């Protein structure tokens, strides 16, 4: 990945984000690289923002897979559309300007994989614009709401994957009746406490697959865990 003024260049695509309230960040990259795309012909990205995760999943999935990306904010929707059209997977990624809950309620076909990097900053955080407020605040919808929406359009053997702050992820695990089948604790720097949780849920009971991922080692260099996960995307790896 290479940073430019208005976006980031990855090995196979570029993401512009100057129109978006929420820019390209590590959370989205982690989810896009970590979510299990196996046996996923229909993939849904809820709250796609720049389209980053949708394009990462397009790169990782088979040529037969279709990715549907939903974004409510008009500026972000237009940005995601432009990023998709400039990518190698424009024929497989479809972007919709729609409320995520409404999209899930009205979906005719089920999805094999649903991903979400939902907003998680609490009310009271002073944001620069109403657009950024919309992207960041959880006052309107809880994370369990996102999970419930997704479950409405999930195939019987499908999976829902999310990235959340550690405490928010722990709270979600207590609130949902879905089965957590994969849990990855993300540690920003070796020796520190986990800061993020990558979680995968299913309608079917399966053995939990726990893991840890370290981003930086003690010398502030990228850890082999992170390099191994993101090497197909970052230009430096």
Swiss-Prot record:
MF terms in GO: nucleic acid binding; tRNA (adenine-N6)-methyltransferase activity
HAMAP family with a match to the protein in the record: tRNA_methyltr_YfiC (MF_01872)
Enzyme class: transferase
InterPro entries for the chain: DNA_methylase_N6_adenine_CS, SAM-dependent_MTases_sf, Small_mtfrase_dom, tRNA_Adenine-N(6)_MTase, tRNA_adenine-N6_MeTrfase
GO cellular component, one term: cytoplasm
Descriptive protein name: tRNA1(Val) (adenine(37)-N6)-methyltransferase
Keyword tRNA-binding set for record: no
Family that this chain belongs to: Belongs to the methyltransferase superfamily. tRNA (adenine-N(6)-)-methyltransferase family.
Organism of derivation: Pasteurella multocida (strain Pm70)
Pfam families: MTS
Superkingdom, taxonomy of origin: Bacteria
Swiss-Prot/TrEMBL GO biological process terms: methylation; tRNA processing
Purpose: Specifically methylates the adenine in position 37 of tRNA(1)(Val) (anticodon cmo5UAC).
Enzyme Commission number(s) from the entry: 2.1.1.223
